[in-house]
Structures are given as structure tokens and as C-alpha cells.
């Protein structure tokens, strides 16, 4: 499955910005490639920049990393439910509510990178387990 194979009826308009930014890899190669690039990028960041925030109501770099982890976990769970044929409307989540309780700024860069890597590898394993028919299942989520 590639981003270019998606029809606009298969996702909410909100996600089009993100889908358009995705390179047109097949899913497995895209997940692995972005894992490698993201880890290289995160490892290159100086520690003194990880708690940088450009405005008082914005997230730090650590909080952004934690958001990536949390969002991938939520979306992988949704994908599993859709692949299994779940037709229930899945609840949304408020990433802005998650951020303060994530305590991301108390974590080390290594801890965040480790969790990101583990979550991405888990997502890759999950998507590897899906057949093509499972990958094209459509579900509802707020």
C-alpha cells in the first residue's frame, strides 16, 4: 500500500496535509526508512535543544518526540481494529491533554529514542502481519 493509492473518501480531509508529505514508499519500506531517518536526526540533536520551545504555549522538542510515539501507538491500535473488521466508531484523543501528563521533559533523549524505536518496530510487525485485504479495510475514528 502506498499513499498514492488512497482515495480521498478513505480519510478525513484533516489528514491530507500529512498524506501529501509522505513519500510514496510502500508501507513497510516507508516505516523502516522513516525510522532510520528519524533516529539519525534525533541522535544529532544537542541535548540543550531538547527542551527548547519557541513560544510559551508550544511543545518542546522532547514533547514533540513523545507526541510522535503516542500518535503512532494510537494509530497502530486503530489499524489493528480496522484490520480485524471492527466497524465501531473509535474515540478520538486530545494530544494537547496528553502532553502535560507525558512528563516528556523529564526523560532522557536515549529513553525517548528507545521508546520511539520500539513503537515503530512494533508498528512494522503489526503491518507485516496484515494481508492486503486487511490493509484496505476502512474504519471510523474521531
Where are the regions that the model predicts?
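Histidine-centered divalent metal-coordination motifs
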Residues: 67
Amino acid at each position: 500500500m502506498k499513499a498514492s493509492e488512497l482515495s480521498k473518501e478513505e480519510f478525513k480531509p484533516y489528514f491530507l496535509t500529512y498524506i501529501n508529505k509522505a513519500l510514496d514508499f510502500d508501507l513497510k519500506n516507508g516505516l523502516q526508512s522513516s525510522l532510520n531517518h528519524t533516529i539519525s536526526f534525533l541522535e544529532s540533536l544537542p541535548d540543550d535543544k531538547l527542551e527548547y520551545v519557541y513560544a510559551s504555549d508550544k511543545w518542546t522538542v522532547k514533547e514533540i518526540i513523545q507526541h510522535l510515539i503516542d500518535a503512532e501507538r494510537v494509530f497502530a491500535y486503530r489499524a489493528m481494529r480496522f484490520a480485524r473488521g471492527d466497524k465501531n466508531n473509535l474515540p478520538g484523543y486530545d494530544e494537547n491533554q496528553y502532553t502535560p501528563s507525558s512528563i516528556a521533559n523529564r526523560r532522557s533523549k536515549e529513553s525517548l529514542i528507545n521508546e520511539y524505536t520500539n513503537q515503530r518496530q512494533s508498528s512494522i510487525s503489526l503491518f507485516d502481519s496484515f494481508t492486503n485485504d486487511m490493509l484496505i479495510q476502512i474504519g471510523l475514528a474521531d
